[in-house]
Amino acid sequence: MNENMTGYPSIDKPWLKYYSEEAIHSPLPDGSMYDYMTACNEERMNEPALNYFGRKITHRKLQTEIDRCARALSACGVKAGDVVSLCLLAIPEAVYLLYAVNKLGAVANFLVLNATPQELHEQIIAAKSKVVITVDLAEKQITEAVKDSCAEQVISVSLAQSMPTVTAVLFRMKAKPAPTTLTSWNSFMEAGKNVDAIYPANTKESAAVIEYTGGTTGKAKGVVISNGAANSVAFQYKCTNGHLLFSKGEKFLDILPPFYAYGIFVGIHTPLCNCLENVLIPDPSPQNFPRVLLKYRAQHFTGGPLHLNKLVEYARHRHVDLSFVKTAAFGGDGMSEEWKASTTDFLKSHRAKCGIVTGYGMTETAGTFCTSTCQSTQMIPFARNNIKVRDIDTEQELLCEQEGEICVSGPSLMTTYLNHPKETDEVMWAEDHTRWLRTGDLGYVSKDGYLIITGRIKRILWAMSGDVVYRVYPMAIEKVISSHAAVKQCAVVGKADGERGYLVVAYVVPHRNDEWPQVQEELAELCRKELPETSWPYVYHPMDKLPTTPAGKVDFRALERMAAEES
């Protein structure tokens, strides 16, 4: 080790060797999300910003629609500091509204479309939203959610609103939308026609967006993200030292809904600030992914493992040329090292210019905090971010290669949990004028500066063997089970066993159900071979699919309830 190195990742920052001096020291953007997006494209006004079902929307048109939306919102009484609740998919109106709300100095509260009406009701009240705008698909839930709430105006927008004319007619004929009692989009826009909007000075410290946590291990919380945090993500994607190869005018396929933090900050804001043409796909289903990717031939795309799995399935029986692909970025549950390797092989065998690009982040870090490169699936923090690893018992900082809780700092950290100061204080602290966030994830930083995630603290179980208490790590068990060729997906939870701690319960999605008896025996043998006795599952349950949260993540709470109900 270099004599000037301390061994502590937060001091040595070994990942900085992968970045240029410009990436490390360039000033971060000031102002609002709207300000930064506009500044990045001020010389590209006639270039396409958005692509929706083949209809291209230039930056000039985008600016016009943002201003029209801002006037319409002003007609509804929206002003600086107000919160506008949006329940939308990846459609042009979501982009217009994001930046219009931001330009007014207000806050965009993105509601999860498949949340329950009660959850939506609570989120609207917590944000004190007087204006709610929903896509027509969610009208039923929103109509129920706004009852006895603070919402005074509720507007509905159709998925077909910005489609090309013929496509829109065919869509409406097929969809047969029910009559609405909500204010239509056209009426909303008409009301702002002669209104003068007031655009206040907007700072990087001002709140810009509220997004909601995934709720995999607890109730979803609203996360307040500032302008500066949002802009730092887009800016740092520009400064990856060529690890990600963006060129002006290339296409970015946006298939993730804006109610995911990743969908807003990486799916909308980052492509626009990097001068890419954003292809908006309102149907986020994995089944739709292969068709739209090959139709638009987008050089850059992002999604979850299920999206790429569908592409792999699609390509089994067809000739698929992916030579146009330059960035295939994925995050979320189910990304084992074996999966990363096999999907990278798939991409390269179909002539893609990259393998899998993986990221690490959370809603509290504006979606992403680390990224890998096109050459490796190992993740490095962005240049302006920092990481320390702390012992989960003593909270003492650990050295490189030592496993503990991952704690992060940097410009993309959230401001607060909405209306939850106690929970905010539990995960954030200040040290030497630097704000730090506890991620709840286990891992370590390698001597080469790579971040390795090994587990989730909230999911750690304990078990007794003799008189000794042992920690049990579900992710380690999942890794072993997932290594079996017959396993498509798995999740491990604990079942309370009194003073003995927890029994390990494994839920497994096999590739073929008819092979399950043999697979179950082989999994038991594999776990006995690879894991300590306290980590052996006492039961293996086959499933057609694992339950998921509204955010699309594995719902471990649902699995824990299932395990608890077993006799």
Residue ranges: model-predicted function:
Residues 1-57, 61-76, 161-177, 201, ...:
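N-lobe entry segment of adenylate-forming
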Residues 157, 531-554:
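AMP-binding/adenylate-forming catalytic domain of the ANL superfamily
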